[in-house]
Amino acid sequence: MNDMKRLLSYAGPYKRDMIFGAVLVLVETCFELFIPILISNLIDIGVANGDIPYIYRKGIQMGVCALCALVTGILYAHFAARATYGWGAEIRKAEYEKMQQYAFSNLDHFAVSSLITRMTTDVTVIQNMVSAGFRPITRGPSLLIMGIGLSFYMNPRLAFVFLVCTPLLGFILSLIVRRVAPMYTKLQSMVDRLNNVVQEGLTAIRAVKAFVRDEYEEDKFNEVNTDLTAASEQTFHYAVLNLPAFQGVMYTAIVLILWFGGNMILKKQLAVGNLTGFLSYVMQVMNSMMMIANVFLLLTRSMASAHRIVEVLDEKIVLTSPENGVTEVTEGSVEFDNVSFKYKEEAKEYALSDVTLKIKAGQTVGILGGTGSSKTTLVQLIPRLYDTSRGTVRVGGKDVRAYDLAALRDAVNIILQKNVLFSGTVRENLKWGNVDASDEEIWEACRAACADEFLNRMPDGLDTVLEQGASNLSGGQKQRLCIARALIGKAKILIFDDSTSAVDTATEKKIREALAARKNVTKTIIAQRVTSVMNTDQIIILDDGKVHRIGTHAELLADDPIYQEIYASQMKGGDENGSESL
C-alpha cells in the first residue's frame, strides 16, 4: 500500500475532481437507498388499500430518485474520467522525466522492454483500477453501512439472518485475494518477457531475415506467449471464484430470509411490502460486498504494477550535477590521473586499470586497441557518462565531477559506434547539435562530414523525412549525418567512436581534412584502421584495459610490437597512406 500512497502524490492536480466524484457517488447512493422504502410503502399502503393517488405519488417520487441518481452518475463519470486519465498522465510524465535523468549505470538495472511496460501497461493497470474501482470503493462501504442500518430499521430479526452471512462472504473473498496477489506480480513479469522478445525481434528483423531465423524467433515468441497465457489462465481461474462465492452466499441468505420472512407473514408479524423492501436492501448489501471484493482484486493487481512503477521513480540517480557546478568548459584539454573503472562495484576485475594520460587542447589523438580493450569505456568517462571507480578525469583542467552535467556534455560531443537518428526531417535531427543553428551552419557541417554529397541529390534536401531508425538511409549516410550533427555544436572536444567505419577511405580522408581545420577543438578518434589515426598528434594503444603505449605514428612504428603488428596486417598490399595498390 505504501507504493500506492506514493503514486497518489501525483494525483495532486486532480484531487478536487476525486472529491467531487466521491461526493456525487454518495449522493447517488442515498437516492438509490431511498427507493426500497418507497417500494415498501407503495405495496403496504397504496396497493393494500387500493389508494391510486398514493401509488401515483410514490411512483413519481421513485422516478425522481432514479432521475437524480442518473444525473449524479453522469456528473461522476465526467469528474472520474478527468481524474483517472490525468493521474495516469502525471505518473507517465514523472517516469519519463526520471528516466531522462538516468545515467548509463542506472539503465543497466532495467531492460528497455521492462521500462516500456512500466510506462504503459503498468500505468494502464493503475488507471483501470481507479476507473473501475473508484465508484465501487466509494459506493460499496456506504451501501453496506446504510443498507445494514436501514434493514435493521425495517426488521431487526430478519437483519440478523443475513448479517451472519456477511462475515462468511468476507472471509471467502479475502482468501481469494490473498491467493491471487502474488500471481499478478508474476503476470507482469511475464508481460516484460513478452515485450522483450517482441522488441528484440522487431529491432533485429533484418538480421532475422538475413540468417533465415524466422522459425526460431517464432518458437521463442510462442514459448513466452504460452507461458503468459498459462499464467493469465491460472490467475483468472482463482480471480473468478469471487463470483460463485458471492452468488452462493447471496442465494443462501435470500432463501433463509424468504423462509423466515414467509413464516412471519403467515403469522401476521410482517407485511409483504416490508419483506420486498428488505430483500432490496439485502441485495444492495450483498452487491456492495461484491463491489468491495472486485476492488480488492483490482487493487491487488495494481499494487504489483505500482511497485514496479515506484522502482523506476525511486531509482537512485548515480550521476548528478554538483551544487553551484562549473557552467563553462574554457578549453579542451583532457587528463586521466591514475584512473580505474569497473561497471559494477561487486565486479572483481576492472575494465580500465591505472590509466594516466594527457591530451592538450586542440590536439588530435587516436586510440587503437583490440576488441575488448575498453576504448569506448575510456572515452565515456570524459563527458561523465560514467564516474570513475578510482582516480580523476579532468577536462579544461577541472575535475569532471565539478562541472554542471549539461555544461560538460555540451562541451564534449560523442559520435557513437551505433548511428542514432530519429524519425523526422534531416534538419530536425541535425539541430540536436545546436537547436539555434541556421541553415548555413547546418550545410557547413554537412560539407565537413561529406553529407552534402547525398543530401544535394535528395529532392527535399534538409527537409527529407527519415523513417524510423533512418531505415531509408545507408550505413555510411547515417554516419555522415551523425558526424555533421556533432560538428554543428560548439563543442570543445569531439570524440569519434569508430564513427567512420561505414564510409570509404576517400570520404574518410575528406572528413579528416575537415576536422584538421578545426584547430581549437580537441579530437579523439577511436578507430580500427591505422589510416584513420596515423596522422594524429599522438596515438594511444590500449591493451586489456591498460595504456600500453603512447606516441606518434613514427615512434610506435619504430619500436612498438603491437602497433607494428596492426600496421603490418592492415597495410599488406597498400602504401603508407592506406591506398590499395593495383
Regions found by a protein language model. Give the residues of each.
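Short intracellular "coupling" helices and adjacent cytoplasmic loop segments at the cytosolic face
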Residues: 49-50, 85, 93-117, 121-123, ...
